[in-house]
Amino acid sequence: MNGILAVYRKELEDHFSSTRFILLSTLILMVSLVIAFMVGSGLRDELKDVAKPTFVFLMLFTFPGKLFSLISFIAFFGPLIGIVLGFDSINRERSDRTLSKLVSQPIYRDSIINGKFLAGLVTITIMFLAIVLLISGLGLRLIGVVPGPEDVWRLAIYSLISIFYISFWLGISSLFSVIFRSMATSALAAIACWIIFSFAVPLVASPLADAIYPVDQSTTAPDPELLVQHEQARKAISLLSPMTLYSEATTTILDPLRKTTQSLLLMGPMERLSISRFQNPLPLRESLYIVFPHLISLIAITSLCFAVSYIFFMRQEVRST
């Protein structure tokens, strides 16, 4: 345990003093605040003469401003945080010839990779919680609505899901750092996975579903069973993307009016407020039931990536030269 803590403290100090991490975290924080400001200003203007519902505070995170929502921003660019923290975690030690010195210390070998992953996880947690707290404070000032207990719980669960989502990319980049000796190669491999899973998979989901279950668009009344099979196939393919898992889970958690992980309608704030008068929002427990498979999937793939990294690292030969 002492070995893990020693590596953890050293890596945590390196992360917070790294120039690239400081620049990336500052950029993400600034963009997040700009998005929250635009969304908050728009909500304040539209809700000026309207009775504010209890969940209006959560709209800061779910509704797009002039660009996109905070959920979409974290879904697309949050993985870069994990990649930056992990792509050189092991091969940097190899290139600096310090890995053999670490292994020769009176610590267990697995303390090295465990301490490095723990430091990355804590760094992600601190950074994301700082973003959520700053946006919440900005929202309090802009829309003047104090979040209720359920809003706080939903934000806490949203933060937990986001931390696991970014940690998955930390595990992916750490795995490539163990496999490849070149830091540039591991970084490119991690970025390639990010592009494939975040952009390519959602784009090809519909064409693949069309190929598996072709729907004749020329007919006025297509087969309902075929339409259901087509939609199920498209959803199954899109769920291969961690970004889709994350987006559906967090949107359902932060939007109490959503009773499914996928919505066919796009509504603005005023439409949301109008429809809320005719339906009751889901309680937190019901929302958790809906997103529980997504949360378990994110935890599973994150654990799998770290486990594979752990096995590869423990079986690799470490030479002193």
Residue ranges with predicted function:
Residues 87-122:
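Helix-loop-helix units of permease transmembrane domains in multi-pass membrane transporters
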Residues 32-44, 54-74, 119-174, 178-179, ...:
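Secretory targeting signals
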Residues 19-46, 69-83, 189-205, 301-305:
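Hydrophobic alpha-helical transmembrane segments of multi-pass membrane transport/permease proteins
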Residues 34-42, 183-237:
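Transmembrane helix segments
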Residues 179, 292, 296-321:
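Junction motif at the cytosolic side of a transmembrane helix
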Residues 18, 22, 163-200:
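A structural motif at transmembrane helix-loop-helix junctions in multipass membrane proteins
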Residues 1-29, 318:
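Aromatic- and glycine-rich beta-strand/loop motifs that create alpha-glucan
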Residues 46-84, 285-297:
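Membrane-embedded or membrane-proximal helical elements that form or frame transporter/channel pores
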